[in-house]
Amino acid sequence: MSQPLTVECPTCGAPVEWTAANINRPFCSDRCKLIDLGAWAAEEHKIPVSPDAEDELFSEELPPRAH
């Protein structure tokens, strides 16, 4: 049987075995998983978007919605 893949925990950098038995993957612990969740909730992490993508999304060319 081959060695399981080992990755770094995104929060603390500890080595983590990527196996089905590790319920916290890619994190090393529940604590690191919750720290990451808190960072997303506090908007410390963001998904990059091009500056004009929001303009296209909310374009005035769209018909007004019926209320």
From Swiss-Prot:
> How is the cofactor bound, as the UniProt entry phrases it?
Binds 1 zinc ion.
Q: Which InterPro entries does this entry report, sorted A to Z? A: DNA_gyrase_inhibitor_YacG (IPR005584), Znf_NHR/GATA (IPR013088)
One example of a Gene Ontology biological process annotation: regulation of DNA-templated transcription
Using the UniProt annotation, give all residue ranges assigned to the region (Disordered): 48-67
Pfam families from the xrefs? YacG
Q: What cofactors does this protein use?
A: Zn(2+)
Keywords annotated in UniProt: Metal-binding, Zinc
Residue positions binding Zn(2+)? 9, 12, 28, 32
Record's signal peptide: none
Keyword Nucleus listed: no
Any GO molecular function: DNA topoisomerase type II (double strand cut, ATP-hydrolyzing) inhibitor activity
HAMAP family for the chain: DNA_gyrase_inhibitor_YacG
Q: Which NCBIfam families match?
A: PRK00418.1
Q: Which family does it belong to?
A: Belongs to the DNA gyrase inhibitor YacG family.
What is the stated purpose of this protein? Answer: Inhibits all the catalytic activities of DNA gyrase by preventing its interaction with DNA. Acts by binding directly to the C-terminal domain of GyrB, which probably disrupts DNA binding by the gyrase.
Q: How does it assemble?
A: Interacts with GyrB.
Supply the name of the protein.
DNA gyrase inhibitor YacG
